[in-house]
Swiss-Prot record:
Domain called KBD: residue spans: 197-252
Record protein name field: Sprouty-related, EVH1 domain-containing protein 2
Annotated compartments: Cell membrane; Cytoplasmic vesicle, Secretory vesicle membrane; Cytoplasm
Pfam families: Sprouty (PF05210), WH1 (PF00568)
Species whose genome carries this gene: Rattus norvegicus (Rat)
PTM annotation: Phosphorylated on serine and threonine residues. Phosphorylated on tyrosine. Phosphorylation of Tyr-224 and Tyr-227 are required for ubiquitination.
Superkingdom of the source species: Eukaryota
Keywords for this protein: Cell membrane, Cytoplasm, Cytoplasmic vesicle, Membrane, Phosphoprotein, Ubl conjugation
Domain SPR stretches: 300-408
Tissue-specific expression: Expressed in the eye, with higher expression in lens epithelium than in lens fiber cells at postnatal day 15.
GO molecular function: protein kinase binding; protein serine/threonine kinase inhibitor activity; stem cell factor receptor binding
Function: Negatively regulates Ras signaling pathways and downstream activation of MAP kinases. Recruits and translocates NF1 to the cell membrane, thereby enabling NF1-dependent hydrolysis of active GTP-bound Ras to inactive GDP-bound Ras. Inhibits fibroblast growth factor (FGF)-induced retinal lens fiber differentiation, probably by inhibiting FGF-mediated phosphorylation of ERK1/2. Inhibits TGFB-induced epithelial-to-mesenchymal transition in lens epithelial cells.
Quaternary assembly: Homodimer and heterodimer. Able to interact with SPRED1 to form heterodimers. Interacts with RAS. May interact with ZDHHC13 (via ANK repeats) and ZDHHC17 (via ANK repeats). Interacts with TESK1. Interacts with NF1.
Residue ranges of the region described as Disordered: 127-171, 274-294
């Protein structure tokens, strides 16, 4: 890119990490722009290039490793945006084509919402919109794509002698951990051996539960975990190895030790008896190796990569999750015939085509597509059952009787 502009960080309405792609019409494929590499791509509000005093929107991409501007494209009302797949979107302005390969479907959806928001503001003529497209209902705790620093910048934590601050990888809320020492050092001499104790750690906001951790491994959690990596907290808290320390999660006071030891009557021990026969073989129960799902706990879905609440997770909440009813409807109604016809006859150079039953009148092939579907229904009459079955399925999704459910990542 010859002309470089550096918009203010506050002017972005959405910003994600992606690989900028360029279209090669000679070979009919997409290739990385300027040698590839992860770039910070966002939609920001800038002054209109024509200098008429009005504001416009610019899609700005800057490669991370060398700060090279690899993408600059002004958003226009006639911008044609295509979602080829969940992680690759491309658009066309005049005769120029741009594409982005996102790192996750959540990034792609956030960028799509940002572009649509910019186009709506241009159509309405109001570019003073200060509302951001992010809200807690659509995005999770980790889906904040505005100017946020990487997790590596927050990984340094100050070590204190008695108080440490850590944060959960699924939340930015910080908590204090207080280590209670039941044996003060002032009461013992240096040469006196201290009795062995188990340090008690209290998390005031979590439910009461005993889990094991390995004290030989130092765990330092950062304040902002990358959602593409497995959570560190679940890795260490689910360990079943024997440990010398116990961590207790409690709301109030720390209860007493829950281990119960069997009582043996003193009459069983006599002179001349074999002491091996009186060995107590009962062992204390082991702590649970799996944490139960707490009330209001949020996890990330493996299908759509969005955060969800386990208590509110019902059918129809995840559009990307497998839906057996929807798959059965498409097979019974032979919709694969319509998909094959549209792919071979009405697809664009990238192989994308409109949904067979779409009612979008802005499509150039709207009338031709429906006429072809009507003609095809005479050869496959079962296609006429698709619309009624799809309407029933939609009602079932609204009633939470069918549809896909979120699935927590392991």
């Amino acid at each position: 890119m010859t002309e470089e502009t550096h918009p203010d960080d506050d002017s972005y309405i959405v910003r994600v990490k992606a690989v900028v792609m360029t279209r090669d019409d000679s070979s009919g494929g997409w290739f990385p722009q300027e040698g590839g590499g992860i770039s910070r791509v966002g939609v920001c509000k800038v002054m209109h290039p024509e200098g008429n005093g009005r504001s416009g929107f610019l899609i700005h991409g800057e490669r991370q490793k060398d700060k090279l501007v690899v993408l600059e494209c002004y958003v226009r009302k006639d911008l044609v945006y295509t979602k080829a797949n969940p992680t690759f979107h491309h658009w066309k302005v005049d005769n120029r084509k741009f594409g982005l390969t996102f790192q996750s479907p959540a990034d792609a959806r956030a960028f799509d919402r940002g572009v649509r928001k910019a186009i709506e503001d241009l159509i309405e003529g109001s570019t003073t919109s200060s509302s951001t497209i992010h809200n807690e209902a659509e995005l999770g705790d980790d889906d904040v794509f505005t100017t946020a620093t990487d997790s590596s910048s927050n990984s340094s934590q100050k070590r204190e002698p008695n108080t440490r601050t850590i944060s959960s990888p699924t939340s930015c809320e910080h908590r204090r951990i207080y280590t209670l020492d039941p044996y003060p050092m002032d009461l013992y001499h240096p040469d006196q051996r201290l009795p062995r104790s188990y340090p008690q750690v209290t998390f005031p906001e979590d439910d009461e539960e005993i889990v094991r951790i390995n004290p030989r491994e130092k765990i330092w959690m950062t304040g902002y975990e990358d959602y593409r990596h497995a959570p560190v907290r679940g890795k260490y808290l689910d360990s079943t190895e024997d440990a010398d320390s116990y961590v207790r999660f409690a709301k109030g006071e720390v209860p007493k030790h829950e281990y119960t030891y069997p009582y043996v009557d003193s009459s069983d021990f006599g002179f001349g008896e074999d002491p091996k026969g009186n060995v107590i073989k009962t062992q204390p129960p082991r702590a649970k190796s799996r944490r139960r799902k707490e009330n209001g706990e949020r996890s990330r879905c493996v299908y759509c990569r969005d955060m969800f609440n386990h208590e509110e997770n019902r059918r129809g909440h995840c559009q990307d999750a497998p839906d057996a009813v929807r798959t059965c409807i498409r097979r019974v109604s032979c919709m694969w015939c319509a998909d094959s016809m549209l792919y071979h006859c009405m697809s664009d150079p990238e192989g994308d085509y409109t949904d067979p039953c779409s009612c979008d009148t802005s499509d150039e092939k709207f009338c031709l597509r429906w006429m072809a579907l009507i003609a095809l229904s005479f050869l496959a009459p079962c296609m006429c059952c698709y619309l009624p079955l799809r309407a029933c399925h939609h009602c079932g999704v609204m009633c939470r009787c069918c549809g896909g459910k979120h699935k927590a990542a392991a």
